Amino acid sequence: MKSYSITDVGQIRSMNEDVVFASDIPVGNLPNLFVVADGMGGHKAGDFASKFALEVLLENIRGNREFNPVKIIRNAIEDANSRILKEAADHECMSGMGTTIVLATIVGHYAYVANVGDSRLYLIHNQDITQITKDHSLVEEMVRIGEISRDDARNHPDKNIITRALGAVKDVEVDFFDIRLVPGDILLLCSDGLTNMVSDDKIRDAILTGETLEDAGKS
């Protein structure tokens, strides 16, 4: 297994509120771990939220003696959500902060995936790209009920309104997915900073034409 991670502020925002974590080696009882979180909130609150969520997540996973990957991930995400809510309640400047999160761990032939918000995980398999996670966003709901098309969603004025996030409510709802992998499969975790700007087909092409994962990430 090979992995590569990169984050960039881009040309739109003045501050990068994304954090990434990639470990090919065990984290607690998980054999590996890959995380992307995209913070939100005024001033530096969004930047803090994503970093704090990752910090709590890793702390929880490393201290968990459970062996079931879904239980480990669920417990860690719920802990991060509770801690973000407490920080926001204790510090007025952090009020309203939150973060998306998408993470994956590969156990044997399976990838176990969780997400909250609109950060995504894609599977690239046999030249095809498939979005595994479902966005928790207003425009995704509009697409689901047929109000707008998938293409319209990318440029919709409300594309940044999300319906779930860590730090939004006490009882966070987490989506879980499991994927059977075969040799040659590629997983991509990313925030909306990529998917708002680049189509799925162009993402796939960049990954498949890169000689290495680093080439693909930097393209």
Model-derived segments and spans:
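PP2C/PPM-type serine/threonine phosphatase catalytic domain
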Residues: M1-S219
